[in-house]
Amino acid sequence: MAIQPGEARATGAGVEPVASPDVVWLRLETLSPRARRELDRIVAAAVALADREGLEALSMRRLATELETGTTTLYRYVTGRDELLELMVDAVNGSDGQVTGRPTAWRDGLTLVAREARARFLAHPWLASQLVARPTIGPNTLLGAEFVIAIALELVDDPDTAASVTSSLMAYVQGSVAAELAEREAQRRTGLDEHAWRETVAPWVRSILADARFPAFARVVLAADDLSFEERFAFGLERLLDGFATLEAHGPRGAATRKRTS
């Protein structure tokens, strides 16, 4: 029977996995140094284009134009746009200094991870949208995942709970960044910064403040500090970490669930 991609074959040295040609990370290992340099150049150009004009501008044809080459030449290195995007994500995770190494105290470590991720998402506005489906499993991305998972396991020695900690942390960062990027896009689309927009809607807001149906809204608008995106991010992150800290006192969710159902 023919061996299917991903199966194993017997060799004189034992069992050897058969590489699937569809897994780009395995295919990269077979490239010559020259071909790898050319692929890195292609990926770097794609990242620059997406940073500058967004993912909607990224196509194989447009990228070929940017590189002053033929579209068919690009297909010698990548199978298509989806594979290119996977390479772009991993390249950004490596070139932007994603945190790696031994975990520090869990709270400091998770704070560092969150702030590094926020900076990366803001520098590459297309990036967060690529992390909401199947995860990229390139080497740079996996090093970052290893770092944050190790920190979560320092907090709570339970794989289920550690996985929930890491996913909750990244979901918070992505949600926070989405709001900030939406404001950037609104400014680009309307030509109004936040101050100018507030001046535009001021007459309507004043009428709302005088309406007895909205006392809580009026109190916040009139009395609350006008926090920056950075300050809002920091506040939310600290509250999330406070929640994680309770895991030390009450034990892991996963372990507790297993005890109740056993």
Per-region residue spans from a language model:
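N-terminal intrinsically disordered/low-complexity leader segments
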Residues: M1-R36, D211-L222, P252-S262
